[in-house]
A protein has these predicted regions:
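Beta-sandwich/jelly-roll carbohydrate-recognition scaffolds of carbohydrate-active enzymes
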Residues: 2-200
Length: 200
């Protein structure tokens, strides 16, 4: 069952690339995204507060949260969220949907890139990735690879590729964010280049 929480805030950032879109709240939580297209099943549907399961979101949380700020990087569609803890620690979360030239064509995959970076102190973060399927009614089956995990949705397989140790993501354990880290969420395919290069 879900734990009680404050009513949802509709002051949301939008990330997209004409193939993919997501709504991100002020605390760096993806609360809405339909997959694999805009008219698809909302794997991230926390905006509607589904009651059947505690899921439908993709959050990057800082322990001892104190405050946050959110804005777009100048002249870009890159959403920057800074999370502060009450001990002087801070992290930056950059969210964007990539769009680039590939084989002489503009490539805009169904994909979200999340780049995490420590800014100050010794911030401890927790990643919670809990997609749902069938319009929030069911928890999808999960399968684990060497540096990725995938969820079997109704019409599509969702894959997270990351340089964060997978047990920390799978078990939602807090960890010290002491270096830049990358989370790439998209189709169940191998990335065309290295994770760090792809996340830039």
């Amino acid at each position: 069952m879900r734990t009680p929480r404050q009513p949802g805030n509709l002051d949301l950032g939008v990330v997209g690339n004409c193939s993919f879109s997501a709504l991100v709240d002020a605390r760096a939580r993806v609360v809405w995204s339909c997959l694999p297209g805009f008219d698809g099943d909302p794997a991230f549907c926390d905006l509607l507060e589904p009651t059947a399961h505690d899921g439908g979101y993709f959050s990057v949380e800082i322990d001892h949260f104190a405050a946050s700020e959110q804005a777009y990087l100048d002249n870009t569609a890159i959403l920057r969220t800074v999370l502060h803890d009450d001990r002087g620690g801070a992290i930056e979360v950059l969210d964007y949907a990539p769009r680039f030239k590939h084989h002489e064509r503009i490539y805009h995959p169904v994909m979200l890139v999340r780049r995490l970076r420590p800014l100050s102190g010794s911030p401890r973060v927790r990643i919670r990735l809990r997609p749902l399927r069938s319009w929030g009614a069911q928890v999808p089956e999960r399968r684990v690879g060497s540096n990725h995990v995938r969820w079997l949705l109704d019409d599509w397989n969702l894959r997270l590729t990351t340089d964060v140790p997978l047990p920390l993501v799978l078990d939602e354990h807090p960890f010290l964010l002491d270096r830049e880290s990358h989370l790439v969420l998209g189709p169940d395919e191998t990335l065309p280049q290295g994770l760090a290069g792809f996340g830039r």
